[in-house]
Amino acid sequence: WAWTTDEIDWVEMLEWTNTVHSYGMVAEFFVIDEEMDVTMYLLGMAHPTGTQRLWSSFSNDEKQHLSTLWDERIIRGTGWYIPEFTSWPCESIGVEHLSGRHLRQEEGEWMNVMLNDLELPSELELFNDLMLRGVLMRPGFKYGSRWRVYDTPVGEAHAPWLVQPVDLAPVNWEAACLAVRLSEGV
């Protein structure tokens, strides 16, 4: 258990949850607020998987086509816009917009790494891990997270997962509880 003002050690929480589950038990965590009310959370592990094409499934021709389109990109805010094209083989990257495709910052940076066979920077490791699982990621801003993560194309169902990188995660239980409340709208 913890007070709402207690700091969170996310690594410790992960280890504790795994230990509890290894004994065949349910990991329940209780947070006590300043009015002495208790909120209980069930903790678990998620291993998202989806149906999106993986980078390794693209043919050399498709990768070359993406490279040609990437060379035509236009900086837009913190992302990129790829103007007028006839086909886009990577549906999990970017969104259609004004006869082109808009890529968010992490999508464009990841695409650049893949197309140019560069070393993956540490800040893209989580994004890459999720891409390797075949999921589709969209901004999670409205839900208090970095990404909302889909196992199917957007619009077929609600996002089954919200993902927040640990370096952006709440630092105390009050902030974590607020994030959970916000995410319930998903």
Regions found by a protein language model. Name each.
Residues 1-145, 149-186:
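Long Lys/Arg-rich low-complexity intrinsically disordered regions in nucleic-acid-associated proteins
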